[in-house]
A protein has these predicted regions:
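N-terminal module of bacterial RNA polymerase sigma factors
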Residues: 1-27, 144-145, 150, 177-180
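Structural recognition of an alpha-helix C-terminal capping motif at a helix-to-coil junction
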Residues: 30, 44-51, 66-78
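Internal acidic/polar
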Residues: 2, 90-115
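Sigma70-family region 2
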Residues: 10-11, 50-65, 87
Length: 180
């Protein structure tokens, strides 16, 4: 079904574009909100993403649904990163590599919080922390790839992840304590 939609979109079929939009808008909105929690900004980024998806479709070679989905997600992530960089909202803190090696990677067990609560806590992180944790945890990117995408050092990516986890850990503990 998806392959036929792609073929129809490549022939400029507006109904197929609408169907594809309806199929993926919810999932891609979730991806977008992980990076851009502001409602208006996220809607702009999502709209730009769909414009890019539809304009890039002419050269897209469909293989299978999972790779197509990955392509869609990659476009949304790149558009969100472009949005944040364009507005200079990504700020990064550098740590010396030796300091990074000494840091622990302990995380609390979030047994008592829901996925929605965790998503909310992540959305409250500063843009730089939130961006790196999303790229590393949800998109599965390495620090090297994150550094390339964001124009930062690998050590900076690692330190942002460390600080994001620390802050998230404190927020989770506060939430758990508040519930008890």
């Amino acid at each position: 079904m998806v392959e036929q939609l792609v073929e129809r979109i490549q022939k400029k079929d507006l109904r197929a574009m609408s169907q594809l939009y309806q199929m993926y808008v919810e999932e891609l909105s979730s991806v977008c909100y992980r990076y851009v929690p502001s409602d208006d900004d996220a809607k702009d980024v999502l709209q730009n993403s769909f414009v890019k998806i539809f304009t890039s479709m002419a050269t897209f070679e469909y293989r299978d649904e999972p790779s197509f989905r990955g392509w869609l997600v990659k476009i949304v992530v790149n558009e969100a990163l472009h949005f944040l960089q364009e507005r200079k909202r990504l700020q990064f803190t550098d740590l010396h590599e030796a300091t990074l090696l000494q840091m622990s990677d302990e995380e609390p067990e979030p047994d008592h919080i829901t996925a929605d609560e965790l998503h909310q806590l992540i959305s409250e992180l500063p843009d730089g922390y939130r961006t790196v944790i999303n790229l590393y945890v949800f998109e599965g990117y390495s620090h090297k790839k994150i550094a390339e995408l964001l124009g930062i050092k690998e050590a900076t990516s690692a330190s942002q992840l460390y600080y994001a986890k620390q802050r998230l850990s404190r927020s989770i503990m506060k939430l758990i304590n508040k519930k008890q």
